[in-house]
Amino acid sequence: MQRVNEASIAVLNDLGTLDPTFDVQQIGLGLLLTVEIEPDDDEPTIDMMANRVLTLRCFDGPQGSLPQSVQEIRGEVLSIPQPLTSLHSPATGRPQLVAEDTDDEHANLTWIRFNEALRSGNVPVYEGRYGARMRIGSIVDGPFQFTLISD
């Protein structure tokens, strides 16, 4: 999760050009989320994590303090699905991305539910597309990067 001044996402087609069936999604001040869904994530976990995102006080206040959440600043969220992957880096120097053994349908539906939970906090939420190749742009307000874990 990154605090951003602006961010955007476009979906690419098989040729690496913009997919005309997907409207570019853009936000102003808010949060850029890269969301990984674990196989055991369930509705209570999703609700808890959405609440953490909505209430995390990570936006500036007086004298460098961080007293405000994305809800309080009336910010926006750009949510990007991140399938679980690992990088296998052999001695040959040619790394390979290896997809973890996950249920894509569960991950996609759970990610959609997570975005709905964010929206229930009265924050505008824009989305990428699960399983798609995407071009992501951002102007980070930081350096602030947060990792929220459900444990």
Question: Where does each model-flagged region fall?
Answer:
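Extracytoplasmic mature domains of secreted or surface-exposed proteins
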Residues: 1-9, 16-22
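Flexible glycine-/small-residue-rich
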Residues: 13, 35-37, 81-82, 138, ...
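Compact, glycine-rich, soluble single-domain proteins
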Residues: 28-74, 81, 85-99, 106-113
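Generic secondary-structure signature for well-ordered alpha-helical cores
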Residues: 54-58, 119, 139
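Glycine/charge-rich, flexible interdomain linkers and switch-proximal surface loops
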Residues: 62-77, 126-139
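Short, low-complexity, polybasic intrinsically disordered segments
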Residues: 92-103, 141-151
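Short, conserved loop-to-beta-strand elements that form functional interface hotspots
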Residues: 108-137
